Swiss-Prot record:
It is an enzyme of class 2 (transferase). PANTHER family: 16S RRNA (URACIL(1498)-N(3))-METHYLTRANSFERASE, RIBOSOMAL RNA SMALL SUBUNIT METHYLTRANSFERASE E. CDD domains: RsmE-like. Its EC number is 2.1.1.193. GO terms for molecular function: rRNA (uridine-N3-)-methyltransferase activity. This is Ribosomal RNA small subunit methyltransferase E 2. The lineage of its organism: Bacteria, Pseudomonadati, Spirochaetota, Spirochaetia, Spirochaetales. It is found in: Cytoplasm.
């Protein structure tokens, strides 16, 4: 574990008080941390604190802050729009995209999704997915805490056409080159379909909206593999673009 992830309500001046029973158990009983030990603490969407344990009580840990690194906004934010996946595949995908780094995760019930999420009864999934995201942040040391959203289809999402350039992963698309220009946009949206690909109505919709259709110089990928590959591909392109 490279860091723990906490909310801002754990702050007490220059100190951080950890009262969460699971975190307490892991740090005290599993990792055997003691007074004087150091640990990085990520406060969601705020800062990373290099901290030191000053007191361990029967049900709390008190940290003092040695250094504060503010979380700077990236030059580009990446949002992914992925179809709901069957079984535990979505858990693995979430863990890996968080480790790579993504600003927003949108899970959509595509027309051809084999497994669909009940949007009106998603509280249990939200809780489970949030735990997966936190665990991935702890293990990877990534500072980007992504938002997660659920939608019933691709047609009525709150797309941001003025600030975001959207790319649809599809076999009919163009292969992106290192010369791809991302000028005038601060966000990238990557749209990946289900195992059965997009429906005809979804493809027509994306074309009407002027989205960019792209493909990758690879064999046909499973949906879960395509999500990871697409995100890593765009991250590499953006790093080259930003020098």
């Amino acid at each position: 574990m490279k860091q723990i992830v906490l909310d801002e309500n754990c702050l007490a001046g220059n100190f951080i008080i950890v009262k969460d029973a699971k975190i307490y158990h892991h740090l005290v009983n599993v990792r055997r941390l003691k007074k004087g030990d150091k640990l990085n603490i990520l406060l969601k969407d705020k800062e990373l604190r290099a901290s030191e344990i000053v007191k361990i009580g029967s049900n709390f840990i008190k940290f003092t802050t040695n250094k504060i690194d503010k979380i700077e906004k990236n030059n580009f934010e990446i949002s992914i729009f992925i179809s709901s996946l069957k079984g535990r595949k979505i858990d693995l995908v979430l863990r890996q995209v968080v480790e790579i780094g993504v600003s927003e995760i949108n899970i959509i019930n595509a027309d051809r999704s084999v497994s669909k999420i009940d949007i009106n009864n998603a509280s249990a999934k939200i809780l489970r997915f949030s735990k997966i995201i936190d665990e991935a942040l702890k293990q990877s040391g990534n500072k980007i805490v992504p938002k997660i959203n659920f939608y019933n289809n691709f047609f009525y999402l709150p797309y941001s056409f003025c600030t975001t350039r959207y790319y649809v992963a599809h076999p009919s698309g163009m292969i992106l080159s290192k010369n791809e220009s991302f000028d005038n946009f601060g966000k990238i949206g990557i749209i990946i379909g289900p195992e059965g690909c997009f429906s005809e109505s979804e493809i027509v919709f994306f074309k009407e909206k002027g989205f960019n259709f792209v493909r990758f110089n690879t064999p046909i990928l499973r949906a879960d593999t395509a999500i990871i590959y697409s995100l890593a591909y765009f991250k590499a392109l953006l790093e080259d673009y930003n020098g």
